């Protein structure tokens, strides 16, 4: 749980009374919108009903770090100045559309190369004579694979939605690879924070308890 204090430091492991013990980490200054210190410090705290052991400390901190990474992935990505919510559902939808558009694009290119006289045409007009002898001009499918694009995605928030229509595979590819690059960057940042977290200070504290 995120807490605030005007103190310049906190006890990382502290008895609260009634058998409760506080575990604290991520102590840092609270900043305003301009990035200036406010005189208040933030820290994370989890309360135990016993002295937390080092494996419990690692589990609590790791779970928090995972939540931080998940939150950054969910709501931290912006594309062309639009907020993109990267929920698991949205990630799946973006991947499905990208994969289908990529495969279809290759199939269309191959079909057009084999049928240069019909390239770019999903239908052609043909004259058909009915049983009554009437001639009708109707569209007839050529067999060319159907285009996936254009496709529209909803970005922004429910209160301020923004819609973007993708007309080309190149733009869709740029969007999707940007999403994947951002997600991978979030994971790498999370791994770095996990690897650099110093648990030795907690181990030393526990020795004296």
How does the language model describe each region?
Residues 2-209:
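A preference for well-ordered globular domain cores
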């Amino acid at each position: 749980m995120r807490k605030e204090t005007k103190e310049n430091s906190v006890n990382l492991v502290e008895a609260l009374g009634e058998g409760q013990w506080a575990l604290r980490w991520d102590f840092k200054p609270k900043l305003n919108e301009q990035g200036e210190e406010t005189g208040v410090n933030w820290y994370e705290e989890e309360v135990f009903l016993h002295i937390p052991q080092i494996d419990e400390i690692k589990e609590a901190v790791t779970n928090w770090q995972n939540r931080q990474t998940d939150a950054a992935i969910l709501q931290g990505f912006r594309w062309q100045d639009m907020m993109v919510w990267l929920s698991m559902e949205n990630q799946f939808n973006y991947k499905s559309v990208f994969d289908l558009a990529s495969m279809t694009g290759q199939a269309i290119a191959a079909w057009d190369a084999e049928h240069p006289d019909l390239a770019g045409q999903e239908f052609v007009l043909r004259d058909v004579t009915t049983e009554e002898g009437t001639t009708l001009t109707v569209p007839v499918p050529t067999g060319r694979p159907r285009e996936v694009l254009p496709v529209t995605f909803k970005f922004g928030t429910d209160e301020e939605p923004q819609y973007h229509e993708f007309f080309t595979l190149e733009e869709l590819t740029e969007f999707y690879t940007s999403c994947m690059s951002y997600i991978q960057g979030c994971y790498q940042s999370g791994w770095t924070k996990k690897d650099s977290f110093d648990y030795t200070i907690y181990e030393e504290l526990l020795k004296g308890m």
